[in-house]
UniProtKB/Swiss-Prot annotation:
<keyword id="KW-0963">Cytoplasm</keyword>
<dbReference type="InterPro" id="IPR000597">
    <property type="entry name" value="Ribosomal_uL3"/>
</dbReference>
<comment type="function">
    <text>Component of the ribosome, a large ribonucleoprotein complex responsible for the synthesis of proteins in the cell. The small ribosomal subunit (SSU) binds messenger RNAs (mRNAs) and translates the encoded message by selecting cognate aminoacyl-transfer RNA (tRNA) molecules. The large subunit (LSU) contains the ribosomal catalytic site termed the peptidyl transferase center (PTC), which catalyzes the formation of peptide bonds, thereby polymerizing the amino acids delivered by tRNAs into a polypeptide chain.</text>
</comment>
<dbReference type="Pfam" id="PF00297">
    <property type="entry name" value="Ribosomal_L3"/>
</dbReference>
<dbReference type="InterPro" id="IPR019926">
    <property type="entry name" value="Ribosomal_uL3_CS"/>
</dbReference>
<dbReference type="GO" id="GO:0006412">
    <property type="term" value="P:translation"/>
</dbReference>
<dbReference type="GO" id="GO:0003735">
    <property type="term" value="F:structural constituent of ribosome"/>
</dbReference>
<keyword id="KW-0689">Ribosomal protein</keyword>
<dbReference type="InterPro" id="IPR009000">
    <property type="entry name" value="Transl_B-barrel_sf"/>
</dbReference>
<dbReference type="InterPro" id="IPR044892">
    <property type="entry name" value="Ribosomal_L3_dom_3_arc_sf"/>
</dbReference>
<comment type="subunit">
    <text>Component of the large ribosomal subunit (LSU). Mature N.crassa ribosomes consist of a small (40S) and a large (60S) subunit. The 40S small subunit contains 1 molecule of ribosomal RNA (18S rRNA) and at least 32 different proteins. The large 60S subunit contains 3 rRNA molecules (26S, 5.8S and 5S rRNA) and at least 42 different proteins.</text>
</comment>
<dbReference type="GO" id="GO:0003723">
    <property type="term" value="F:RNA binding"/>
</dbReference>
<keyword id="KW-0687">Ribonucleoprotein</keyword>
<comment type="similarity">
    <text>Belongs to the universal ribosomal protein uL3 family.</text>
</comment>
<dbReference type="InterPro" id="IPR045077">
    <property type="entry name" value="L3_arc_euk"/>
</dbReference>
<protein>
    <recommendedName>
        <fullName>Large ribosomal subunit protein uL3</fullName>
    </recommendedName>
</protein>
<dbReference type="GO" id="GO:0022625">
    <property type="term" value="C:cytosolic large ribosomal subunit"/>
</dbReference>
Length: 392
């Protein structure tokens, strides 16, 4: 073999094995940021729904870079984040084998959209969930609930709230809300319990958890591609054109001995629908979707909403709070995203840069998108035949 390379690193990482379908549809937070008792009490994560992507223009503020003080065009993702409702509190004890939950305290009133989470078939069920538990709040002025909260204060080191999304406020057809544990960081354990208990049955908006220019992580399940071949799945080299019996294959899958195929060999199989954590996404904007100027900037003062003309394709309109993050995030549109505070303190100039947007694209996602607002389109096209028919 002439001109053979002396080294050929393997194709594809073995760090993410097994490449199989995720066990859960919702992105799970496997670790929360380190707690610091000196900081004020705060929540560390939230959930939202991926609406789509758009384009922004801004001036780069990065001294030393070639593009410093020049316009840059960047892709951003819009995540629909209706306020989450806190419905419970969980206390954890540290043991030699990790965290163990001591007890869970639930709120008195739970909406149907979160109760659906506890049923396989809501339509046929008797809907009796939490009917016995609710009596604890009324018996002896909630003495049992108070006792459990005191136990958490006495024995626990980690406190998390149970919060669910308000999925009915989104354009999605699904009625079952997503429920997750959100760790409370900062302050003493007693402060954490009081903070969490004070949030019971109350909405928690996204701007009370994250802020503009913060760097966050997005946890989600990636887009599924089904059963794919080895070339698409692992990125192995295609064989020469004249190869017998196919060329999108691995030519040698191992030696004679050991007489089995090793686990490190690239094979065909499931691609996508994997649980992934995408780190270091900078928040460019947190806004209200129903505000008339949610996509306006200091340079482009046009009154326009963040929803593009005709809505986000395969999602719809955003009428709640939203988060605009830099770049793309895992998963398809409509998929639930878990947003988590970063695991460490960022010190780089890139992470600490203050972002000022100059323009946000709100043109239609269908076609070439020539117009930013319906008014601009009408002004350009003038009076149409359909307008005359409607007026007559």
């Amino acid at each position: 073999m002439s001109h053979r390379k002396y080294e050929a690193p393997r194709h594809g990482s073995l760090a993410y094995l097994p490449r199989k379908r995720a066990a859960r549809h919702r992105g799970k937070v496997k670790s929360f940021p380190k707690d610091d008792a000196k900081k004020p009490v705060h929540l560390t994560a939230a959930m939202g729904y991926k609406a789509g992507m758009t384009t922004i223009v801004r001036d780069l503020d990065r001294p030393g870079a070639k593009a410093h003080k020049k316009e840059v065009v960047e892709a951003v993702t819009i995540i629909d984040t209706p306020p989450m409702i806190v419905v419970g509190l969980v206390g954890y004890i540290e043991t030699p084998r990790g965290l163990r939950s001591l007890t869970t305290v639930w709120a008195e009133h739970l909406s149907d959209e979160v109760k659906r989470r506890f049923y396989k078939n809501w339509y046929k069920s008797k809907k009796k969930a939490f009917t016995k538990y609710v009596k604890k709040h009324s018996d002896n002025n909630g003495a049992a609930i108070t006792r459990e909260l005191e136990r958490i204060k006495k024995y626990c080191t980690v406190v998390r709230v149970l919060a669910h999304t308000q999925i009915r406020k989104t354009p999605l057809k699904q009625k079952k809300a997503h429920l997750m544990e959100i760790q409370i960081n900062g302050g003493s354990v007693a402060d954490k319990v009081e903070f969490g208990h004070g949030l019971f049955e109350k909405p928690v908006s996204i701007d009370s958890i994250f802020e503009k220019d913060e760097v966050i992580d997005v946890i989600a399940v990636t887009k599924g591609h089904g059963f794919t071949g080895v070339t698409a799945r692992w990125g192995t080299k295609k064989l020469p054109r004249k190869t017998h019996k196919g060329l999108r294959k691995v030519a040698c899958i191992g030696a004679w001995h050991p007489s089995h195929v090793q686990w490190t060999v690239a094979r065909a199989g499931q691609a996508g629908y994997h649980h992934r954590t995408s780190v270091n996404h900078k928040i460019y904007r947190i806004g209200k979707g129903d505000a008339e100027d949610s996509a306006a900037t200091e340079v482009d003062v046009t009154k326009k909403k963040i929803t593009p003309m005709g809505g986000f394709v395969r999602y719809g309109e955003i009428n709640n709070d939203f988060v605009m993050v830099k770049g793309s995030v895992p998963g398809v549109k409509k998929r639930v995203m878990t947003l988590r505070k970063s695991m460490f303190v960022h010190t780089s100039r890139k992470a600490l840069e203050k972002v000022e947007l100059k323009w946000i694209d709100t043109s239609s996602e269908f076609g070439h998108g020539a117009f930013q607002t319906p008014a601009e389109k009408k002004q350009f096209q003038g009076t149409l035949k359909k307008d005359l028919a409607a007026s007559s």
